[in-house]
Structure formats: C-alpha cells, structure tokens
Amino acid sequence: MDKKGWSLKGSLLPLLLLVSDLLLCQSVASLPICPTGAVNCQVSLRDLFDRAVILSHYIHNLSSEMFNEFDKRYAQGRGFITKAINSCHTSSLSTPEDKEQAQQIHHEDLLNLILRVLRSWNDPLYHLVTEVRGMQEAPDSILSRAIEIEEQNRRLLEGMEKIVGQVHPGVRENEVYSVWSGLPSLQMADEDTRLFAFYNLLHCLRRDSHKIDNYLKLLKCRIVYDSNC
C-alpha cells in the first residue's frame, strides 16, 4: 500500500473507534430497565444476560480507556506497573484467571463471585469520582468516564441480582465483598504516592472488569444456550 493509503487508514482509525464507542454507548443507554418499584415487570433470563454482557463490555472499555489516559498523563517514567502487580483490594476473592479455570466452577458459584466483585467496587468507585473531581488539571474525559463507570456498575449489579433471582429463586446470597481501604492513599500530600494510588485503582478496575466480562460471556453460553455456543 502506498503512503497515501497508509495516511488515509491512519486518519480513519480514530474515527472508526469513536463511532464504535458511540454505538456501544447508545446500546447501553437503550437497554430495557424495569421502572423502580414496578411490580409486574418481567424480563426474560436471556434478555437479562444480553443486557449484562453489553454492560460489562461497556464498563471494561471505559475502564481500559481511563487507565490508558491516566497512564499517559501521569505515570510515564514512574515505574508504577511493577508495584501494581497483585495489589488489588479484590485479590482476597479467589477468582479464576482464565477461561479454562472459570469453566471448572459451578455456575452458581461463578454468579455469586461476580456479585461479590461488583459489590467490592461500589465504595472505591464512589470515592474515585469524588477524588478525581478534586485533582488539579484532571481532564474531563477521565472524570466523565469515572462517573459513567460508577453508574453502570450499579446497573450491572442490579441486573446480576435479577439474574441470580431467576436462576436460583428464593435463595438469598449473603452480601459478601472485599473491603477497600485505599481512600487515604488517594488523598496523600505526596504526589508520587497519590498518583500511584490512582494508577493502582484504575489498573485493578481494568483487570476486574475484564474478568467479569469474560465470566458473564461464559455464563450466558452455559445457562442460556446450554453450552451450545
């Protein structure tokens, strides 16, 4: 391909990625939700899984974009990645690392594990939004993504609770989750310590959102399509 062709391709790629993100965002915005307090609102298990998979994929995309932007703006040359390995607050939850491991887990246990991970992010996502608002010169794109992820995480958690209610009606799962204690680090006066705390939190969010996305796709195949997919 000539140089002109490569130039055209390079100029089109960001536009295609933007269109893809906009379409995914529109898909999330148009997902059917039962009105709060609705008594007779029934959504099929298949529709619930469809919605959950779209939401989880959307959250993972936003998490990856937010982490990548933060990394470029604040973490270059600081060696944060070597310190971030195995330092997530959700590491206390035993989560399968790949598809093969996840396939060995009973679907009931995997559903409950997703609930625990999602609940473990309620508090840190709330404080992430609050602290990013207070960051000097923090770009609006990072703040807007943090706000969107917090909202969609709540929606996904509500959807997962409905899924568990249909798969195992009458069974109430204990609200077990991993406690996050990283707020003081996000508020440290030392810039390097504070920036690493943000970096680590976003790194863990990207990791966990990717796991949830994969687990949900596996569960949808197993439960909705009886593993015929």
From Swiss-Prot:
UniProt keyword annotations, A-Z:
Disulfide bond, Hormone, Lactation, Phosphoprotein, Secreted, Signal
List of residues that carry Phosphoserine: 56, 64, 120
Set out the biological process GO terms recorded for this chain's protein: female pregnancy; lactation; negative regulation of endothelial cell proliferation; positive regulation of canonical NF-kappaB signal transduction; positive regulation of cell population proliferation; positive regulation of lactation; positive regulation of miRNA transcription; positive regulation of receptor signaling pathway via JAK-STAT
Q: Which GO terms describe its cellular component?
A: extracellular space
Q: Name one GO molecular function term.
A: hormone activity
Q: Where is the signal peptide?
A: 1-30
Q: Which Pfam families is this protein grouped with? A: Hormone_1
Among InterPro entries, the record links this protein to: 4_helix_cytokine-like_core (IPR009079), Somatotropin/Prolactin (IPR001400), Somatotropin_CS (IPR018116)
Q: Where in the cell is it found?
A: Secreted
Listed disulfide bonds for this chain? 34-41, 88-204, 221-229
Give the function comment from the record.
Answer: Prolactin acts primarily on the mammary gland by promoting lactation.
Complexes and interactors:
Interacts with PRLR.
Family indicated by similarity: Belongs to the somatotropin/prolactin family.
Q: Which PANTHER family match?
A: PROLACTIN, SOMATOTROPIN,PROLACTIN
Name the record gives this protein: Prolactin
Q: Which organism is it from?
A: Ailuropoda melanoleuca
Q: What is the lineage of its organism?
A: Eukaryota, Metazoa, Chordata, Craniata, Vertebrata
Gene field: PRL
